[in-house]
């Protein structure tokens, strides 16, 4: 499996699988620019004895092409009524690659992240993050020329069409089923 981001939701499910005797192997993307995957997810999984291999974000396609990934799992910040999600920048690209290689993508999120008033990802605001996160943050010296413009959005929108299922505390939903929750609330 391949992890992309730092969400606690999927980690809980991995811990539970391990407790039930499954021995998951997790490829953990570094998750730039803040390196949450390297600093947090890999740390947490290693701490409880899960087999973790840290990878650069750009290695996902290579892993999938080589048949090393059974599924991708991510958390998310927000889910729109149509099943689009907002999550850490790079999630959309990861999901596009996964679809190409026929690797399922699961979003692990509590139902509290569902915003039924938000029709689609087009209605979500995307925060711009500071340039230093890309140019300076984890480097002894700045790694980019002084004054270079930086594009650093915090999240991107992954369309529902790229998502296999949304794992909530109430079970697994297809993205198209999110809209129906309104009728049941």
What do the PLM-derived regions correspond to, one by one?
Residues 7-20, 95:
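Histidine-anchored nucleotide/phosphate-binding helix
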Residues 19, 25-31:
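Extended Lys/Arg-rich, glycine-bearing segments that form polyanion-binding/interaction patches
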Residues 29-185:
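Conserved phosphate- and dinucleotide-binding cores of soluble alpha/beta proteins
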């Amino acid at each position: 499996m391949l992890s992309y981001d730092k969400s606690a939701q999927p980690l809980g499910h991995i811990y539970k699988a391990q407790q039930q005797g499954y021995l998951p192997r997790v490829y953990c993307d570094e998750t730039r620019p803040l390196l949450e995957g390297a600093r947090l997810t890999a740390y947490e999984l290693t701490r409880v004895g899960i087999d973790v291999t840290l990878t650069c974000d750009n290695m996902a396609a290579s892993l999938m092409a080589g048949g090393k990934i059974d599924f991708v799992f991510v958390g998310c910040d927000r889910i729109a009524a149509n099943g689009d999600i907002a999550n850490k920048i790079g999630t959309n690209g990861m999901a596009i690659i996964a679809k190409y290689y026929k690797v399922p993508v699961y979003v692990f999120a509590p139902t509290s992240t569902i915003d039924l008033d938000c029709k689609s990802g087009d209605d979500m605001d995307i925060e711009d993050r500071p340039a230093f996160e890309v140019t300076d943050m984890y480097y002894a010296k700045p790694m980019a020329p002084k004054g270079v413009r930086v594009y650093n959005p915090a999240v991107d929108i992954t369309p529902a069409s790229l998502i296999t299922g949304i794992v909530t505390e109430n079970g697994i939903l297809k993205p198209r089923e999110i809209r129906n929750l309104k009728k049941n609330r």
